[in-house]
Every structure is written in structure tokens, then in C-alpha cells.
């Protein structure tokens, strides 16, 4: 019965989405379908503040990620096109390549080169093809935040914007030695995002990949070192969900989390904290970009109007309005104005410093797993719990968990994603 109700609810939402876009198309306005900024308050800000400065009326229609490809496929199959521009996360746009639904934007993308969108972000927009299929729109990421009280304990000669994991461990160890407290923190609670730390930061930094080198010797050494560093981590980290709370309370002096989950601390006490990139390992400074892009569908009713809207949304002034109002940060190169909120400035600078780092190594969120994403995350969290929290032998755990990982990847058929090398067929741990 639950499945039936879920199917009916999904079908109703999809039908309402079709009706909304059809009515909007009849009005002659541009149709902008987005999986992002869906909450009522966010959507209102999009319509009334961000799109308000555009010269033409735009109907901003939102869709849940699971509805998004269904709607696009329905238009492709019917031959009736109503949508001009789509906005979605990188991983939500990737499946549209198989549908051959996205119009190439090579010439248009070339005209935007002067805006300073980082090369790696534009490369993501090719979706592993030869063509520019989306233009980066807005971004978030994961950053580190430290209480300024921790700064005197930094290792000699350490640059906070270019820390290594060895230096991070030494920093936390010195704080513990001098204060008697374990003040490094991670969001390892039940609803925390600790799995993203492993998938996007630690594994790429030490192994250069995620799935392929999952059980490698480099991974074994990585887990051994991380288990050692955990001795300086606040034990309450296994309950933390949003790191802004322990940062504000002083229970943690150094923390890692998604920018949205530390932003409140930066906004409340911008003079008390510093924000900076995650650390680097032997293979580079692994980081996981949260990137939303703008694309045009093949058969869009107004191709020129669609590109004009994308042009507007990627202008520096529009990007700043977006950052002020919805907390997504610019993808273009722009100077933050003097009156920009201090907490947002700290976060934006940390993201910019991450991307511009000479050793930056982007690791995309998992792609192609469908509804099995949580099972993928569980492999990394189970590995963490067994090795770090329970002290089990790293080699034994990695060999066992690699079997689970390979079985999952085979079942989903998901090919490798960056930074793992491209694969023919399902990605596999070697």
C-alpha cells in the first residue's frame, strides 16, 4: 500500500509539473525548470530578487530531483517542448546525456571565458563528452573552520590555506597536549556528512581516487594515519550533525563540514572564526564541489532567450545577489563588495582558495548509483567504524568491504567518475 501511495504521489507531482510548464509556455514567457532552490522561501527569492533584474519575464518552475529526468524524457518522447532552461546539480544533469537531451553550448560557452569561471568547472560542464553541455551556475562545497583560539597552536611554518593532513594532525595533537582537550571535530553523527569527507577529501588526497584504489596499500596507510589522528578528535564527533553548533559552543576549535552546516557560526561570530580549505595528502588536496549548472534542452522553444537568461544568471552582479540571498556562491571571478556579509565572505574565500590551490583535486559526488547512494555511503562509514572506532585491522576490513563495494557497483552498473579513471562498465575496486 505504501508503494502504491508513493507512486500516486509521484505521478500527481509529475502531472502538476507538466501542467505548470504547459501553462507557462502558453504565456510566451521563458520557462526555467530547476531542481535547486525549491523551498518556498528560496523560490520566492529566486523569482522576486534574482530574476527580478532580468529584462524579460521568466516562469521559474521547480522539480524534485527524481521528477526531473522523467519530465525531460516525457518532453523528448512527446516531441512537445516547453522548457527553455534547466538548472540542476552536476549529477542530476549527467543522466540527460544518455537521453541526448542537452543542446551543445560550445560557442556560447566560449563567449563567457572573460568571466573567470575556473577551467575545471567548465570541464565538468562537458559531462565527459566533447561538448559544453552546461554552464556552471552556482556552487557550494565543504570547508574547514577554526576558532581563532586554535591559531597559536599551528605547526611552525604552516599556511592555514595550504595545510597537509600531517600538519592538521600535529595541530590537533598540540592543542590536545596544551589544553588537555580533543578539539578537532567531524560530522560523524547519524545524519552527518562524514561519508562525504571520505569520498571527496580523504580518499582522493591519499589515493588519487575513490572506488578503484579503495583497498590499495595507499588506502591502508591512509586509514592507519587517520585512526592515529582520531585520538585528537572530540569523541562526541560521532553525534555531530551540523558542525556549527559545537564550533559556536567551543566544544570544537577546528571542524570540517558542508559550508551550509557551518555558515551560521560564521554569520553569528565572523570575528571569532577563520575558514580555509581542507588538508592535502600525497596525491593532492582532494575536495568535493557541489556544482549546479544551467543547460538548454534540444528543441527549446526559445534557444536565444535561453542563452540570454544563462548569460544574465552568470553575470557577476547576479551571482552576488544569488550569494546574498540563497547562500550559493559565485562560480565567476568577482570581487566581493565591502558591504558583503562578513560570514559569507569567509565562506566564499575558503571555497575560492580550495579551487585555486595548486594541488586541488576535484572529486565529484557519486554518479549513477540511483537509489543505492546510501549503500555506497555505508561502505565508507562501515570501514571508518571498524578501523577507526573499533580498532580492527585495516587490511582485513578493506578486503571485506571491497567485496561489498564491488557487488554494489556491479548491481548498479555505475561507471567510474572523477577522480577515478574512466571505465568500460561498472567501476570496480582493484
Language-model-detected regions and their locations in the chain:
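Extracytoplasmic "Venus flytrap"/periplasmic binding protein-like
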Residues: 31, 48-117, 152-154, 253-254
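Short, polar/charged alpha-helical segment
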Residues: 37-59, 380, 398
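Hinge/lid segment of periplasmic solute-binding proteins
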Residues: 89-143, 169, 274-276
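Short, solvent-exposed loop/beta-turn-alpha elements that line the ligand-binding surface or hinge
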Residues: 106-117, 160-161, 203-222, 228, ...
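Extracytoplasmic/periplasmic solute-binding protein
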Residues: 125, 129-138, 142, 166-211, ...
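Glycine-centered hinge/linker elements that transmit conformational signals in sensory
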Residues: 169-175, 209-240
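Extracytoplasmic/periplasmic substrate-recognition and gating elements
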Residues: 228, 234, 267-331, 364-365
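Long, aromatic- and glycine/proline-rich binding clefts that accommodate carbohydrate-like moieties
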Residues: 324-386, 414-430
